[in-house]
Curated annotation (Swiss-Prot):
It holds the Pfam family SecE. The chain crosses the membrane at residues 31-51. Keywords: Cell membrane, Membrane, Protein transport, Translocation, Transmembrane, Transmembrane helix, Transport. It comes from Staphylococcus aureus (strain COL). PANTHER family: PROTEIN TRANSLOCASE SUBUNIT SECE. GO terms for molecular function: protein transmembrane transporter activity. GO terms for cellular component: plasma membrane. Essential subunit of the Sec protein translocation channel SecYEG. Clamps together the 2 halves of SecY. May contact the channel plug during translocation. It comes from the Bacteria. InterPro entries: SecE_bac, SecE_sf, Translocase_SecE/Sec61-g. This is Protein translocase subunit SecE. Component of the Sec protein translocase complex. Heterotrimer consisting of SecY, SecE and SecG subunits. The heterotrimers can form oligomers, although 1 heterotrimer is thought to be able to translocate proteins. Interacts with the ribosome. Interacts with SecDF, and other proteins may be involved. Interacts with SecA. It is a single-pass membrane protein.
Amino acid sequence: MAKKESFFKGVKSEMEKTSWPTKEELFKYTVIVVSTVIFFLVFFYALDLGITALKNLLFR
């Protein structure tokens, strides 16, 4: 039981040392991540359409 208590005390100690982002930073980083995901989604969708069209053109 002492090991468990020691573990959770260590976890609490490390969590207090953590630098958490502000609401503004969190929002900013979330927008960046979502924008990047959408960009790559559109990019790879367009690439897939292009490769499919090229394949259909070559192998009619």
